[in-house]
Amino acid sequence: MSLPVTLPLIDHLALRVRDERRSRTFYERALEPFGVEVVESSRGPGFAIEGGGDFWIEEGEPPAAPVHVAFAAADRATVDKFHRAAVEAGGRDNGAPGLRPHYHAGYYAAFVIDPDGNNVEAVFHGDRQLPAT
């Protein structure tokens, strides 16, 4: 089954972080391969992503349980660059770039734990085919 390309389901996401400066540095570097633009607001920095789906961080007490957020990459090279940049920015490797066929054919992703313990993923869906059920 192929998924249609439509508007993003999520318009924006705000993530609470313990140390805004540390997290801003991490996300600026980790998301650089996506070509994000850093924007300022009264609540904290945001990362504008072409096509929608803005991502914001704001200082405060993070949720008790870690969050998993995935950023859609245009290709495998972007996934690779994200992983390298995120680890160099202080993230902890949580899954090197590679195929994850147990999700679906063509699912190419990398995972990094951010400074607050959240699981941050970059994913390229390839042909975007889902497994038959």
Task: Label each PLM-derived region with a short phrase.
Residues 1-24, 69, 126-133:
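N-terminal beta-strand motif that seeds the catalytic metal site of vicinal oxygen chelate
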Residues 3-4, 47-88:
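Long, continuous compositionally biased terminal/linker segments
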Residues 14-54:
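Core segments of cupin and vicinal oxygen chelate
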Residues 17-22, 70-116:
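Vicinal oxygen chelate
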Residues 38, 94-96, 113-116, 124-127, ...:
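Ligand-binding pocket scaffold of soluble enzyme catalytic domains
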Residues 46-49, 102-103, 128:
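Short secondary-structure capping/turn micro-motifs that flank functional sites
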Residues 58, 104-105, 111, 122-129:
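Short beta->alpha transition motifs characteristic of CBS
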Residues 119:
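Glycine-rich acetyl-CoA-binding "A-motif" of GNAT/NAT acetyltransferases
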